Structures are given as structure tokens and as C-alpha cells.
């Protein structure tokens, strides 16, 4: 046995072991293994991202599952990779350009893309290095990037297939537009936040009349693009104006008054301005009545040149100016408060603008049907189960997906335009030219679509594109469908549902069998962690302070299935203390195994005490519990089971009792000592295996010091429960001993008696099994509780001046004579009695008051009665204690 350093220094061992693991190819999946296969694909982090606490939780969970399945003898693949993150990455590069006073248009598309690839090469490896620091046992030789050539080919293939199957179409429609990112967004990329705003009431004069219609709007700047005013056909206020012409304020454009039942007579003034270019509902009304579409905003949210007075103003600046001008022309009535949901870009939180523009869409309903079916029939299992309802609701009400983005970084849409704008969708330009030649009868010049695909489009192929699809590969045969997807609930629509759709569409197979949604990591007061709030600690700083194992274990231990995690650094102290406890217990074990050779032990000659049988039973029970919990994705309960076994059962009890046997060198106790040594080694070695998936570094370091065979703990068999060794009767007997010892320790703590002072104890029990257990384990109890005398029997009298506790069916008395200052104790008890009796008085008065008891609700009376009984019980116990001191 090799000794451990005195102090546990996690940072030193982490770097050492990760390098050994990676260099030794322990993480690599085999393509020729006869073992059962188990696979997970990583939710690809943004290529320019850095590790945050959400990554820590997500990857700690995945690594725990992978390491557990690897140790159960499976051929595991954890597929690594990064996402190109179109908008996010482009924004970073554009900000870099802006430092030099440049825009991307100043350098052109080709140069900008070169610059973005350079940026990716420079910063793209940061997140993968950080995942290594976390101990993630990913198969790094298979690392993928969503814009690798193979994955790009897969994107073009599915686009072509969907298009030629009529599931991708192009058209001019109303979309969500982000003026900051300069691109369209899908519906689910818009976050709706409740905000306080205003309704402005404006006069719209009737042509050739003194009358006017009052319009209420939350976006007065859009009036520049109004083309009509709609009223309800049955609204008596406006019936006489239907068909009349209004003069649009400030613009002086003539617009009609139309009637439609869509208008809500009760909202605002009951008159609705129609702006088809800037509101989805108005857009639909505009199409219905064949109204013109007038655009008043540039793509970056400024007023267009058609309105010289406001041209170039930002939309919100224009709003102020327009309201001022309306007031100046006596066309403004008043402002009202409005609390409403405002759509914001999920990337940059800019208020989105509805905008009519040509875009590419995927028809979602046909794809959604299969995705619904595989969850309903149980092929794909979603955990926690409550997430199924959210999944169903979204898919049952799904809208077509806008997949085109007006940015440069990403997968350029594989569509080419002929001279007359006829579209040719192909795998590459050569194929598009072949199609064009067939269409036109001769060669023509083609221009490729400028837009790129939504980042989530390529991400939806991730489980199979990373394994070589559309080629037929060994990886797909062995590892697809994957077993488990671990992800945050916030991307159930962006990513999870779409992966199922695309997997079913192209491979006719589900992409994964289980989806495990974990919660969001929040701060201790429930806020989502973010840089802007300053409440998001740098995981690398935490790793330096606490060590990776402590962080991983603490995060998993404190994360209930599907619940958000309220994080504080206080949580990490538990993990660090646990690691130190295991380290120190191991040092003790190793120091007491000098000259011990586990291979030479004849197990048939060992002398197993109750404590040995108990720890064997608990080991097997824990192995069973951990397996059940991990397979149900209750990782927190699995971690708690390992913690309670190693910290509680092993360190706090077994090791302490083992000391009694280890320090006894009597000739007739040699077998007892050898048994204790063998059990310490066995339980520690098996316990390290149990703990390894959660805390890989410390377990490897310790295991290497005590191992008999093998190169690494990660390839050892995970402990398998032997039900025949789980003995409920044995456990009950030892739990009784723990209860007796704990009750005596509690008396010392409550009475302020030093643990170093030997005590006299009387245990009276009517239970023969308890009495037998006491008699057989008297030595252990006396040592653990520091007793000079232990008297056990049936129906023994309570000693005077003693403190009583109950353990099982036994009355446990600690004789306080000589341990306490009697006068001081009597004084303390009298003070406590006086305080409790004073607090009880108003409760008694209330319950003896007929007015209260006749009028108060029954649950209030019951509460007061419960309080009264609690006080009475406390007073009774104190009086009994006082009596024992006065005897």
C-alpha cells in the first residue's frame, strides 16, 4: 500500500489523471466490441463559449452516466463537439470589427467569413479545454463541429430532401425581426416579457369633415405605414363612417375605414389602425382586403427615407418625435398606462419588430405527427414526466419554422437563382447548373441564396450527422439511436423536438431513447445566472478553490430531478468536506494495512462481527439503491445513497469501531484484527468504485494506492448487489447500537459534558434481542460512547440524577452524578421551567375564554390545543429531570 499525502490537493491530481486517461484512450468507444453499447451526444456548446454553471451541471450529469455505464461493462460513446452558433459568433466578430470602426459590409462576405473562421480557431478550443478540466470523459478523437464538411454535407442533404418532398418552401411572410442581429427569428426564438408601456390616443380626421376617429396604439411610430382603420361592423359609434376616407396624420395619406368582426369593440377606442407591414394581425387583415403593404423601417430599426422628417431616426426616437408633432398639430388626445407582453430577441434582448420579408420555412405539422407519436407510445421517454405536457402542447399547436437568417456565418442555403429568379435547390452549384440547363435548355449564370440556415437547423441533425450520416457507418449501426440526451428544459422546442422530427424523417428512427431535462442553475434568491447581474461565478475560479470533484458532487447531490438549482458557494463546502473525509479515512486505513496482503487472506478463517455483517449488508443495499436511482435518472438520490454509506456508515461508524480491533495486539485477537483490515480494504475499494462516476479524480488517486489489479478504476466493474448479503435483521441490530451511542452523545452535547469524561450508563430493555445485542457488543458501545461502566438488563430501575433517552425499546440512562454541577443544573432547569410556564399562560387563558372557544374556527382552536400540549410535554420532562437532581 502506498501512503497518501497528508493533505488533499485536488488541483494537482486532476491535471495528472486527466492526461493519463486521455493519453491511454480510456474514453474511446470501440467499433469492434462485443459489449452492449451505450451512447450520449453532448449538447454542443457554442464554439466561442466559455464554461458556466449550467455547463457544469449538464456535463457532470452526462459524465456520471457515461462513467457508470462504462463500469457496468458497456461499450460507451460520449460524442463531443461544438455548435457554430450563427448569430452569437457573428456578433462577436462584428464587435471586433467595430473596434476598428468597420462593419462587415466594409470588408465583404468572403473576408468576413475568413475572419470568423480565424476567430473560431483562436477561441473555439476554450470550452473544450474547460470540459477537460471538469473531468468529462468524452471520446475526443471523434470531436465534431456543426460546420465540418461532413456535417455541412448532411445539412445540404436534409435540406434537399425536405424541399423536394414539399416540406421546405419559400415565400414573403410576416416574420419576427431583430434589428440588432439584422435577421429573422423563429417564433420560439422570441422571449415575451411583461412590461409597462403606454397607449397613445390619436385623432384620425375624416376627409372633408370635422369628425375624427380616435385610435389607441402602443407603437405610434408605425402610423407612418398605416393603410386603413378597421372598426366592428356592429359598433354604433362608427357605423356611419364605414367606407369613408380618413386623412392619416402627419403623412396626409388618404386611408379607408373598413369593417371587420375581428375588431374588439371593448379594447382601446374600438378603432384599429391597420399596418400590414408591421403587425401580424394587420398583415392578415391586409391580405383579406387586398390592402397595400407599406414599410416604414429599415432592417436595423430606423425610419426609411420615404419620410424625410423622421428618416434615419431610431424607431424609439421617432416615437418621441412623432408624439411631439401630433401634440403640436392638436391631433394627440392622451396617454394611458398599458401592461403588456413585449417580444424580445432571445440572443440580445432587443425588442423585435414584425416585418414582411422573403424567407424560407419548414412545414412542421407533417413532421410533428411522428414526433408526437414516439413520445406517446413510449419509444422516447421524457423525464421528468411533467415535461411531456409542454412537449405535446407545443407540437399540437406548432407553426411553420422560419429557417432563413440574414447573416453570413452559418450554412448557406443550398438554393440558386436563375436570371428570372427561378429557384434550383441542389447539393452543390454543379448540380444546380445541371438543373438549370435542363430547365432553360442552355447554360445560365446562377446566384446562390445569400441567407444562411438557422443554427438550430444543423443542430437538429446532431445525433446522426456526428456519426457520419448520410453515409451508412459502423457508428450509426452501433450507437444510433443514442441512449440518453441530457439537456436543459429551456431548449425543448429549439432542439429536442426538432432532433426527434429530423431523426424520424431521415432515418425512420428516434434519435435517443431517454430525454432527461435538468433545471436551470439560479442564484440563491432564484434569479437566473447572468454576467449582467454579476451573480454568475466563474467555474474555473471555483475549481481552483474547491476542486472539480467537490463541485460535481455538490451540484448533483443538490439537483432534484427537473428542479431548478439554487446555487451558492455554501453548497460546495459539503462536497469539499466529503472529499476530505474520504481522503483522511483512507490515510487511516492505509496506515493500518502495513504488512497486509489482501491476496493472501483466507476468507473462510475470518471472524465476522455484527459490525462486519452490517457494513457488508449496507454495501450491497447501497449498490442496489444507486443502480436503481441512476437507471431512473434520480442522480441526486444516487449521490445521497453513496454519501450516506461512505461518510456515515463507513467513516463515522465502521472505521471508528475498527480502531478498537486494530489497536488490540492480543494473540487471541489476531483474527479479529485481520478481519477488520480485510473489511476496511474491501469496503473502501468497493466504496471508491461506487463513488467514481460522481467524483472521478479523488477515487482514481486513492484507488491507485490500494489497488490489487487493474490499470484504472474507471474500467473496474461497478459494484453489483448480492441480495443474499442484504440482511435486514443484522441492519436493525446495528442500527439499535447506533441509536444507543447517538443518544448518549446527544446527552453529553445537551448537558455540556465533555466527551473525554467517562460516564456510567444503565440500559433497561424488555426486548431480548436488544439485550443480546448490547451484551455481545458491550466493548464497542463503551469505546464509542466513552463509558466506564455499562449495566444492561430487563426492568432496571431508573438511576437517580440521570438523563433519559429512548433507543428502540430500551430506556438509556446516563448517570450525571460527578459529570455535572448539580446546583448549576437545578438553577438552569428552574429558569427553563419559569420561561415555559410564562409562555404557556396566554395559551391557557385563550383556551379557557368561552368567547374564543365559541367563535374561533375549529382549526384555530386545534392549533392552540397543539401548542398547549407541546408546552405541557416540555414542562413535564423538565420537572422529571429536576426531580432526579433533587433526590
Swiss-Prot record:
EC number(s) stated in the UniProt entry for this protein: 6.1.1.9
Pfam short name (any one): Val_tRNA-synt_C
Coiled coil stretches, renumbered: 817-887
Motif 'HIGH' region positions after renumbering to this chain: 45-55
Residues reported in the UniProt entry to bind ATP: 531
Family matches, as InterPro entries: aa-tRNA-synth_I_CS (IPR001412), aa-tRNA-synth_Ia (IPR002300), Anticodon_Ia_Val (IPR033705), M/V/L/I-tRNA-synth_anticd-bd (IPR013155), Rossmann-like_a/b/a_fold (IPR014729), tRNA-bd_arm (IPR010978), tRNAsynth_Ia_anticodon-bd (IPR009080), Val-tRNA_synth_C_sf (IPR037118)
GO molecular function annotation: aminoacyl-tRNA deacylase activity; ATP binding; valine-tRNA ligase activity
Motif 'KMSKS' region boundaries: 528-532
Biological process according to GO: valyl-tRNA aminoacylation
GO cellular component: cytosol
PROSITE patterns documented for this protein: AA_TRNA_LIGASE_I
Main enzyme class: ligase
Location(s), subcellular: Cytoplasm
Catalytic activity line of the entry: tRNA(Val) + L-valine + ATP = L-valyl-tRNA(Val) + AMP + diphosphate
Subunit record text: Monomer.
Cited function: Catalyzes the attachment of valine to tRNA(Val). As ValRS can inadvertently accommodate and process structurally similar amino acids such as threonine, to avoid such errors, it has a 'posttransfer' editing activity that hydrolyzes mischarged Thr-tRNA(Val) in a tRNA-dependent manner.
PANTHER family named among the record's database cross-references: VALINE--TRNA LIGASE, CHLOROPLASTIC_MITOCHONDRIAL 2 (PTHR11946:SF93), VALYL-TRNA SYNTHETASES (PTHR11946)
Family according to the record: Belongs to the class-I aminoacyl-tRNA synthetase family. ValS type 1 subfamily.
The protein's name: Valine--tRNA ligase
Species this protein is from: Fusobacterium nucleatum subsp. nucleatum (strain ATCC 25586 / DSM 15643 / BCRC 10681 / CIP 101130 / JCM 8532 / KCTC 2640 / LMG 13131 / VPI 4355)
Higher taxonomy: Bacteria, Fusobacteriati, Fusobacteriota, Fusobacteriia, Fusobacteriales
Gene: valS
